């Protein structure tokens, strides 16, 4: 177990020859797949884990490990420890972001022709990770308004992440990517090989590298999208 865990994991007592690790807090679970395969190919011992890059809750089981025979040579265990090095095979990274802003864009929503149903969806998803929405606005499709609102959210309202909804396609009226770019944010990716959610944008703003995300409309109505894959990793 020593080669597996970091400080965010609790170790179970030995039961039926097996030891399990559980999450000591909510966070993102990560697995070093190459070194895990090394251990499991060594013979006479095994480690089974849940998938890496997945969000977990406090108390969730992360892995189980045991030796296959009744006994094993101490030298073999030591050899595996030396091959794996000092870094644990598994990491549980606590979420750092606690405050977010939601900026809903679109002329029809701004003028009240249709109801903003995007913001409630995001508030519910953020609540699953104990992230508070400290600032929310409904904005017209004008890049200068969206740019100003992003800066206000971060510099005045204390948002540690900004979510911009709508206006993410290549239509002339969809100006959210331009608005994000005009803040001076560093664009990491515009477009993702994921469906639903191909028109996703990820950027980071300012010295503190505050995440600013552009979310396509599918996030509003699809149960699982690129946002659900990316959010735990951004947090």
Question: Model-found features: residue ranges?
Answer:
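Short, glycine/charged-enriched hinge/interface segments at domain edges or termini
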Residues: 2-134
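Short glycine/threonine-rich loop/turn motifs
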Residues: 107, 134-235
């Amino acid at each position: 177990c020593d080669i597996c865990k970091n400080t965010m994991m609790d170790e179970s007592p030995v039961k039926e020859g097996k030891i399990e690790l559980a999450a000591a807090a909510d966070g993102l679970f990560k697995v070093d797949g190459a070194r895990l395969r090394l251990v499991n190919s060594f013979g006479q011992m095994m480690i089974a884990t849940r998938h890496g890059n997945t969000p977990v809750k406090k108390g969730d089981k992360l892995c189980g490990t045991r030796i296959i025979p009744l006994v094993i040579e101490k030298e073999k265990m030591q050899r595996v420890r030396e091959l794996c090095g000092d870094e644990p095979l598994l990491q549980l990274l606590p979420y750092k972001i606690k405050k977010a802003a939601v900026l809903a864009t679109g002329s029809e929503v701004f003028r009240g022709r249709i109801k903003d149903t995007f913001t409630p969806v995001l508030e519910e998803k953020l609540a699953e990770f104990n992230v508070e929405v400290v600032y929310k606005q409904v904005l017209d499709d004008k890049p200068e308004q969206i740019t100003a609102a992003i800066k206000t959210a971060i510099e005045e309202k204390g948002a540690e992440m900004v979510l911009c909804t709508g206006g993410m396609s290549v239509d002339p009226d969809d100006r959210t990517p331009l608005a994000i770019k005009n803040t001076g944010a560093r664009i990491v990716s515009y477009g993702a090989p994921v469906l639903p959610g191909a028109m996703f944008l990820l950027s980071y703003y300012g010295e503190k590298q505050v995440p600013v995300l552009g979310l396509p409309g599918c996030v509003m109505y699809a149960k699982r999208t690129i946002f659900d894959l990316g959010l735990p990793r951004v947090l």
